[in-house]
């Protein structure tokens, strides 16, 4: 019995010890970076693929696999859109630089209503503008890599729960619709960097607008806004805010948290000289247009 216990213990130790010698996701990732630095792009892609197979939420591995594919494509004389899905997963799993790369490489060719649902897995940009739509089309859940959507000049009055499938969007154009109410579902689109709501019928914004932490551009020109929610101040990445041609008389004190805001347009609102001075004091480094 003692021998059995001894042999079993030795085998267990050997198995346990050998597991430390097996490459893990981080090992493969580091090897991939080394291969990338040596311009061995095919090997780098393989190494990052191994890392992802062990850790499917490895945002950095997706990012550098995409970068390896981009460099290999340039070397071979083509760029494959395959790298876009890698960049999207990289963004979803926390690699903030990925969204800039997506905007650079993956939003060139937009699919229209007729073609978008034929091969939904290759659709990164969709143009459904001027289609008399009252909602986003059925089947949108199949557009799993959609990052840019143009719904300009339709007949939307609100957003249905179908919009909750579009969590990878970084650019959304809802201008020139008839939206009177922006429901809480807007707060699920947390990767958005650009949101256009010009020429709608909004009188207020939901608290969930504060969930859009990555927003850089928000355009709300020509609505019926009378007040902004205090949590507009949580949009700390915001650089451009267009509130022209609304019914605003004041802005919440929380706008002072918008430290990156470069431009604020308030033309066509009923803002007194005293309130204008207050806003300038809250945003000393922002270019503000009142008229």
Task: Give the residues covered by each predicted segment.
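Ser/Thr-centric signal marking residues that sit
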Residues: 49, 134, 167, 180, ...
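Conserved hydrophobic beta-strand positions in leucine-rich repeat
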Residues: 124-127, 147-151, 169-174, 192-197, ...
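A generic tandem-repeat structural signature
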Residues: 75, 81-82, 89-102, 166-204, ...
């Amino acid at each position: 019995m003692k021998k059995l216990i001894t042999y079993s213990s030795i085998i267990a130790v050997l198995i346990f010890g050998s597991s430390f010698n097996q490459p893990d996701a981080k090992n493969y990732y580091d090897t991939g970076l080394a291969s990338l630095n040596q311009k061995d792009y095919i090997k780098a892609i393989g190494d990052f693929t191994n890392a992802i197979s062990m850790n499917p939420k490895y945002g950095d591995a997706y990012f550098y696999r995409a970068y390896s594919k981009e460099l290999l494509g340039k070397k071979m004389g083509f760029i494959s859109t395959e790298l876009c899905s890698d960049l999207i997963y990289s963004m979803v799993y926390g690699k903030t630089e990925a969204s800039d790369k997506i905007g650079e490489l993956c939003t060139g060719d937009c699919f229209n209503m007729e073609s978008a649902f034929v091969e939904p897995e290759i659709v990164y940009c969709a143009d459904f503008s001027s289609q008399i739509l009252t909602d986003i089309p059925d089947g949108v859940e199949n557009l799993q890599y959609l990052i840019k959507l143009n719904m300009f000049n339709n007949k939307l009055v609100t957003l249905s729960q179908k919009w909750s499938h579009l969590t990878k969007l970084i650019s959304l154009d809802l201008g020139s619709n008839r939206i009177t109410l922006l429901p809480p579902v807007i707060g699920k689109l947390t990767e958005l960097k650009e949101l256009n709501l010009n020429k709608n019928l909004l009188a207020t914004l939901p608290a969930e607008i504060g969930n859009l932490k990555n927003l850089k551009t928000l355009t709300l020109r020509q609505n019926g806004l009378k007040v902004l929610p205090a949590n507009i101040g949580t949009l700390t990445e915001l650089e451009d805010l267009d509130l022209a041609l609304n019914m605003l008389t004041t802005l919440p004190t929380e706008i002072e948290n918008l430290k990156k805001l470069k431009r604020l347009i308030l033309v066509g609102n009923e803002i007194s000289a005293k309130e204008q001075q207050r806003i300038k004091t809250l945003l000393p480094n922002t270019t503000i247009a009142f008229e």
